[in-house]
């Protein structure tokens, strides 16, 4: 069968081998190929930037740093489906590469004769050029696997760095590493062993970027607090905000105050409800709906406008009534959806969304009641004595980390069934949208400690690492793997990849990953991860309960 594209970066990739005609996500082949060209341009920019850094050239690297992070983010699964949007990024990166190339030459820097550095193209040439720079350009399956594992980790890292940057928090060391890693996977000079080391180094920088974003979020909006979140609806029109960007959340709440419009979170924006600064807004009503993949039904019943601040977008059905009510911003895009730009100061005008909301009916109720969350590291460590006492007394036998992503595959019912089957002396630690598989179950509590502790968004997996390291210290253990903590993680896209690599870099072993192992892991690379880190897939609920809760 003719390959019109090749992409295997997400968990739902066709046959767990790769999408070759159209993305399972809904991305058409021309857009997928254009993303390959965009990443190829970023590799060229990174090679030039790394060469200039090594030469000690004093320059304003900010423009290139932002271009790399923002464009990597735009290629994450379900972020951007808009060919024209990606084409604009390709055009800008060609221009930036030419600018940096000239600067390097004027500084007397000898640049490598690598096609990623030298390639230039006009818009009418993009489709042709894109066909020559895809993933399969690397013919060695194991080398390709290690390179793509690094790149997918970098995509997740870039997403978190971009969020922190929006709040004014930047780490130059993270930017320089990202460029060096792109340089290293492109130049073809590293052995398989060196590429494996680069994968783990990417994980260690994943820890750094999650720490940076945690600092940005908590210093800006306060430490998340234990919060009961309303999942019902009010009587006023609403705006639904989805994604991860808390800066957009802040601006939307500011601009909707006093307008008679309520604001609801959806999907990964749910944890915004836990931040103290947002609680002062009386029109911040609560959360509507569930994980990203249910949006086709939930956007219909919400009745009002929807704002995507990041992934995950699901292409709407042709007859969807909500298509004209969806807005995108930042790295996101979809043909026909309106895009909200920011000004030179990063501010956005949401007046069009607000005006539309005023013409809409209030949301239709799909559920009622409350759910509880806000168990990030500051909150949990404030009750560390209580937690340690519960472990010491045997009241809590095991903590089960079930962070990660949700998805459409029917096999993901496993995670609901697994949560229900866990013994009553276990506590689930979660973050990311995987929580929607079990955060509305009535699992009770242990001595006042809820049996599902939601730390927040996928990046708040950092909180779970902080909690684990603190418990290791308090309990006087010399190895994080001696803690009564086991890992059964659901993955979907590239932010889950950087979380996994971060855990590996911290020395965590015996992580179960599902519902399938990534297609981009070649048999030999998978073998290395299994032998050195105890990485495993999932089995049946009964088998995994026996294995993990011994």
UniProtKB/Swiss-Prot annotation:
Iron among keywords: yes
Subcellular location: Cytoplasm
Disulfide bonds: none
Keyword Glycoprotein: no
Residue(s) carrying Cysteine persulfide: 405
GO process terms (BP): response to hydrogen peroxide
Ligand binding (hybrid [4Fe-2O-2S] cluster): 244, 268, 312, 405, 433, 458, 493, 495
Catalytic activity, as annotated: A + NH4(+) + H2O = hydroxylamine + AH2 + H(+)
CDD domains per UniProt: HCP
GO MF term list: 4 iron, 4 sulfur cluster binding; hydroxylamine reductase activity; metal ion binding; peroxidase activity
Note on how the cofactor is bound: Binds 1 [4Fe-4S] cluster.
Needed cofactors: [4Fe-4S] cluster; hybrid [4Fe-2O-2S] cluster
Primary location class: cytoplasm
Keyword terms: 4Fe-4S, Cytoplasm, Iron, Iron-sulfur, Metal-binding, Oxidoreductase
Protein's job: Catalyzes the reduction of hydroxylamine to form NH(3) and H(2)O.
UniProt record similarity statement: Belongs to the HCP family.
Name this polypeptide is given: Hydroxylamine reductase
Species: Porphyromonas gingivalis (strain ATCC 33277 / DSM 20709 / CIP 103683 / JCM 12257 / NCTC 11834 / 2561)
């Amino acid at each position: 069968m003719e390959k019109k594209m090749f992409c295997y970066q997400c968990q739902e990739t066709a046959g767990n081998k790769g999408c070759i005609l159209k993305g399972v996500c809904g991305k058409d082949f021309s857009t997928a190929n254009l993303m390959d060209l965009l990443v190829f341009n970023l590799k060229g920019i990174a090679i030039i930037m790394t060469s200039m850094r090594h030469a000690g050239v004093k320059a304003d690297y900010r423009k290139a740093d932002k271009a790399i992070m923002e464009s990597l983010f735009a290629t994450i699964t379900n972020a951007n489906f808009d060919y024209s949007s990606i084409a604009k990024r390709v055009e800008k990166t060609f221009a930036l590469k030419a600018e940096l190339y000239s600067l390097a030459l004027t500084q007397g820097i000898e640049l490598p004769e690598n096609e990623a550095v030298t390639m230039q193209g006009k818009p009418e040439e993009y489709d042709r050029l894109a066909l020559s720079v895809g993933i399969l350009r690397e013919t060695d399956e194991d080398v390709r696997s290690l390179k793509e594992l690094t790149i997918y980790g970098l995509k997740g890292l870039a997403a978190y760095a971009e969020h922190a940057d929006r709040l004014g928090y930047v780490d130059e060391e993270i930017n320089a590493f990202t460029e060096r890693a792109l340089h290293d996977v492109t130049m073809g000079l590293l052995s398989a062993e060196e590429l494996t080391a680069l994968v783990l180094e990417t994980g260690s920088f994943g820890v750094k970027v999650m720490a940076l974003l945690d600092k940005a979020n908590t210093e800006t909006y306060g430490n998340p607090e234990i919060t009961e979140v309303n999942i019902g609806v009010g009587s006023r029109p609403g705006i639904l905000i989805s994604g991860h960007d808390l800066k957009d959340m802040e601006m939307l709440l500011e601009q909707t105050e006093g307008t008679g419009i309520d604001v609801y979170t959806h999907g990964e924006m749910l944890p915004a409800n836990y931040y103290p600064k947002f609680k002062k807004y009386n029109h911040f009503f609560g959360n509507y709906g569930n994980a990203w993949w249910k949006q086709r039904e939930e956007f219909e019943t919400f009745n009002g406008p929807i704002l995507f601040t990041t992934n995950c977008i699901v292409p709407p059905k042709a007859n969807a009534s909500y298509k004209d009510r969806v807005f995108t911003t930042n790295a996101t895009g979809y043909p026909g959806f309106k895009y909200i730009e920011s000004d030179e100061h990063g501010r956005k005008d949401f007046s069009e969304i607000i005006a539309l909301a005023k013409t809409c009916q209030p949301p239709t109720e799909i559920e009622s009641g409350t759910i509880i969350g806000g168990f990030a590291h500051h909150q949990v460590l404030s009750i560390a004595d209580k937690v340690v006492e519960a472990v010491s007394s045997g009241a809590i036998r095991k903590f089960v980390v079930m962070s990660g992503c949700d998805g459409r595959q029917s096999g993901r019912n496993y995670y609901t069934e697994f949560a229900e089957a866990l013994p009553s002396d276990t506590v689930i630690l979660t973050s990311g949208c995987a929580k929607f598989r079990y955060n509305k179950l009535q699992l009770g509590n242990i001595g006042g400690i809820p049996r599902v502790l939601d730390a927040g968004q996928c990046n708040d997996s950092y909180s779970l690492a902080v909690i684990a390291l603190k418990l290791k210290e308090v309990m006087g253990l010399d190895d994080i793997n001696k803690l009564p903590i086991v890992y059964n993680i659901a993955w979907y896209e590239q932010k889950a990849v950087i979380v996994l690599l971060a855990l590996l870099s911290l020395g965590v072993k015996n992580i179960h990953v599902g519902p399938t192992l990534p297609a981009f892991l070649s048999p030999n690379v998978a073998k290395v991860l299994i032998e050195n880190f105890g990485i495993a897939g999932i089995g049946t609920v009964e088998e995994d309960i026996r294995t993990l809760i011994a």
